[in-house]
Amino acid sequence: MGIPNLTKGDAMRAAKHYRQLLSIDFNIEALAFVPGPDGTRGRRIHVLGREVRDRPGLVEYLSPAFGSRVALDGYCKANFDAVLHLAYPDHQQWGHA
């Protein structure tokens, strides 16, 4: 499968389209309250998620919860194909041409 001949404008639009497809929101954070000795302690957890289509405000989590952003990034890098498949299940193939 070759790369089609594109004008510069077409190439820029295609690049923007694929950048949007691959832009997974790494900034969704949930605040989980873990009871401490005083019963009010909480800790921030980091999860990969996205809003559910046609259900504004409802978030689907695509990763386990991690205690740090670095740990979440590491998970996403180590499981890149699985994360893409979970994020975009309708897309048939993410392989290289």
Curated annotation (Swiss-Prot):
Keywords of this entry: Plasmid
Recorded superkingdom: Bacteria
Protein name: Protein ParC
Organism for this UniProt entry: Escherichia coli
